[in-house]
Curated annotation (Swiss-Prot):
The lineage of its organism: Bacteria, Pseudomonadati, Pseudomonadota, Alphaproteobacteria, Hyphomicrobiales. Its EC number is 6.1.1.17. Its main location: cytoplasm. Gene3D superfamilies: 1.10.10.350, HUPs (3.40.50.620). It catalyses: tRNA(Glu) + L-glutamate + ATP = L-glutamyl-tRNA(Glu) + AMP + diphosphate. It is found in: Cytoplasm. GO terms for biological process: glutamyl-tRNA aminoacylation. It holds the Pfam family tRNA-synt_1c. This is Glutamate--tRNA ligase 1. Belongs to the class-I aminoacyl-tRNA synthetase family. Glutamate--tRNA ligase type 1 subfamily. A motif ('KMSKS' region) lies at residues 249-253. NCBIfam families: gltX_bact.
Length: 459
């Protein structure tokens, strides 16, 4: 069975780029009757917070992503210790005592000599006495994984290609000789991303790893680690990254692009799903009404190979399109939560939905209709016309035909036409020069409010 995973770090709110990875994995699992694993990468105990774990869970639920299994890396340290010890015993994980400053100096020297800034494995030359000396100075080792890029002598590396058939990008090749041995364990004993990730992928029988293409180099290292652990390799797929319109990478520090924030702002769940999945693919970003329809058009191979820019304006447009098609029954509960209720609520929704970007925006129109309003006065030259319009307002309750009858009469009596006729009335009654059809608004306002507002604006 196909098994995929989404492994967020609960160190902040996840953004649209993160959720794009989650959706690609979720839809891929759905399309192949597979399983979706949620794995919290919370090995950084100090920065990982329960509030972010809760927020990630809430975001996934809102986006209709339902994990089949949930794991926490912080509960698996014993397993990582076991694997690390085995690698140490085999000489594949070795201690290094250089400080960050010393390593930085070496890199600068290598670059000045036009050499690649690859770690030279100097730690492998240390004698037991030298290691003891470092320990006596209070230095604690960090541990590097010995990449298999040599024949007999690890100090003499040779070109060693790691290849895989990426399900998105096709054949990929990484030369392990061009990479430094990765640090798997920090000085303090905490684990970096690589070892826990590979161990979990093995233990959880992950068959497909679908992630951003910023992990391509990591994949070469991880394949070497999979092989060192005598494990079957998963299938890899790397999708293009999203950036801001300025070309900057998305970050958890950009809270306005977090799913938590976008949800609070009133964006539709399916709008974010469609946008995240279809942007940067060969398909148009279409406003599918639900996830099942989106799934039918999901294809991992449609992903572009170039970076894609995320423009919030495009998400607004997509959201608007979806909101305009929502029926009253679909939003009835949400409107009630916004205190939009009563016998006129359905008529109200049908009147205004084409003029809002988000369901929450309906509140502005509801208040415009029901609350006492203080609008900017109409233009001085239009006030006599507004006063005059009162004389020709149809008698009795206002209905579907009232606006047409009223404006037809005004056209005949005043000679006004087009904007000169309609705009002063709209501004007098709503305070705006745009909005829903006035015929529908007239009914919602009711005769008494129409008379009151025209009287005030005609003064």
């Amino acid at each position: 069975m196909i098994k995929v995973r989404f492994a967020p770090s609960p160190t902040g709110y996840i953004h649209i780029g993160n959720i794009r990875i989650a959706l690609f994995n979720w839809l891929y699992a759905q399309a192949h009757n597979g399983a979706f694993i949620l794995r919290y990468d919370d090995t950084d105990v100090e920065r990982s917070k329960q509030e972010y774990i809760d927020a990630i869970a809430a975001d996934l639920e809102w986006l209709d992503i339902q994990p089949d299994e949930i794991y926490y890396q912080s509960k698996r340290f014993n397993r990582y210790d076991e694997v690390a010890e085995m690698l140490k015993q085999r000489g594949l994980l070795y201690p290094c005592y250089e400080t960050a400053e010393e390593l930085d100096r070496r890199r600068k020297i290598q670059l000045s000599r036009k050499l690649p800034p690859v770690y030279d494995r100097a730690a492998l030359k240390l004698t037991p006495e030298e290691k003891e000396e470092f320990e006596s100075q209070g230095r604690k080792p960090h541990w590097r994984f010995l990449l298999p890029n040599f024949e007999n002598n690890p100090l003499q590396t040779k070109r060693t290609e790691v290849c895989w058939n990426d399900v998105v990008k096709g054949k990929q090749t990484i030369d392990l000789a061009s990479l430094s041995d990765p640090v798997l364990i920090r000085e303090g004993g905490s684990y970096l991303y690589t070892l826990p990730s590979v161990v979990d992928d093995i233990d959880m029988a992950i068959t497909h790893i679908i992630r951003g293409d910023d992990h391509i180099t990591n994949t070469g290292v991880q394949i070497a680690l999979f092989e060192a652990l005598n494990a079957q390799l998963p299938i890899f797929g790397h999708i293009n990254l999203l950036t801001t319109v300025l070309g900057k990478g998305l970050s958890k520090r950009d809270n306005d692009l977090s799913i938590h924030s976008l949800r609070a702002e009133g964006f539709e769940s399916i709008a974010i799903q469609c946008f995240a999945v279809l942007i940067g693919t060969s398909q148009n970003v279409h406003p599918y009404p639900h996830q099942a329809a989106l799934l039918k058009h999901f294809n991992l191979q449609d992903t572009s190979r170039s970076v894609t820019k995320f423009d919030i304006a495009d998400l607004f447009a997509l959201n608007s399109h979806l909101v305009h098609d929502l029926t009253y029954e679909e939003v009835k509960t949400r409107l009630k939560n916004l205190s939009i209720d009563g016998e006129k609520a359905e008529c109200f929704w049908n009147a205004i939905r084409s003029n809002i970007d988000k369901v929450n925006d309906a509140v502005l129109w509801w208040k415009m209709i029901h609350d006492e309003q203080s609008f900017d006065p109409v233009a001085l030259e239009d006030r006599s016309f507004v006063r005059q319009s009162l004389n020709f307002l149809p008698e009795g309750p206002l209905n579907d035909e009232s606006w047409k009858v009223w404006t037809t009469t005004l056209k005949e009596k005043t000679g006004r036409r087009g904007k000169a006729l309609f705009m002063p009335l709209r501004q007098a009654l709503t305070g705006m020069d745009h909005g829903p059809e006035m015929g529908k608004l007239l009914q919602l306002l009711g005769r008494e409010k129409v008379i009151d507002r025209l009287t005030i604006q005609g003064e």
